[in-house]
């Protein structure tokens, strides 16, 4: 599904990734681990197409396509999802409108008609129950006034509704208490399926137990990894 070969990346002239190699197959969950500054978030942002990163060498292929030539919205329509370490607020844009617009963008990419509004609300409410979220979240601005834990749950809700082929979760569990961590972990685990893959970006092993073995990120270069056993 995802193939990264000899990827090197700089930011403002400073080398962050140096010759990274990674293979992520369908049905796999990989944990990308390492201390602050080792390039974990850089890799996540490069995959999502965030500007400001210079690729000096290497290739990235996703579903057989050259990912690096695609715009961020094209990557998203192909089923690549990034869960942010620090989810941004979007005042004036309701959660339900964002979710519906995102779902319909993916459906258009697949040649499907727009989702029925009634069925869509039923789907979203089902996923919200899994995330222990009240219906009132739908009418609120995206992450506007949300606590840290609510923002992280909202990120996972987006993933549950969109059902991406590949989700890259950048320290989604960071700063959560034990109860919120259990809810977020349940949401992530509910998406495990043979046709999907997950990469969890973490500093420590404690939150990466769903991936085996972890992939450790060293000073600019990650060590090799192997596919985890089936869930």
Language-model-derived ranges and their functions:
Residues 88-158, 162:
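ABC-family P-loop ATPase nucleotide-binding domains
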């Amino acid at each position: 599904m995802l193939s990264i070969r000899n990827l090197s990346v700089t930011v403002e002239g400073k080398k962050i990734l140096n010759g990274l190699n990674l293979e992520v197959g369908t049905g796999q969950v990989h944990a990308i681990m390492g201390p602050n500054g080792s390039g974990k978030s850089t890799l996540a942002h490069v995959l999502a197409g965030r500007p400001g990163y210079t690729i000096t060498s290497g290739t990235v292929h996703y579903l057989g396509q050259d990912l690096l030539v695609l715009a961020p919205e094209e990557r998203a329509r192909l089923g690549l999802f990034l869960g942010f370490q620090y989810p941004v607020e979007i005042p004036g844009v309701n959660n339900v409108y964002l979710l519906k617009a995102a779902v319909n963008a993916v459906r258009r990419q697949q040649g499907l008609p727009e989702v029925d509004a009634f069925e869509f609300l039923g789907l979203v409410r089902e996923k919200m129950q899994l995330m222990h979220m009240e219906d009132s979240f739908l009418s609120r601005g995206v992450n506007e006034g949300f606590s840290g834990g609510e923002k992280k749950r909202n990120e996972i809700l987006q993933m549950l509704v969109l059902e991406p082929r590949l989700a890259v979760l950048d320290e989604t569990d960071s700063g959560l208490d034990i109860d919120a961590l259990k809810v977020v972990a349940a949401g992530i685990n509910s998406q495990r399926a043979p046709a999907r893959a997950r990469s969890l970006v973490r500093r420590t092993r404690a939150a990466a137990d769903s991936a085996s073995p972890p992939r450790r990120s060293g000073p600019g270069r990650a060590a090799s990894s192997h596919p985890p056993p089936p869930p």
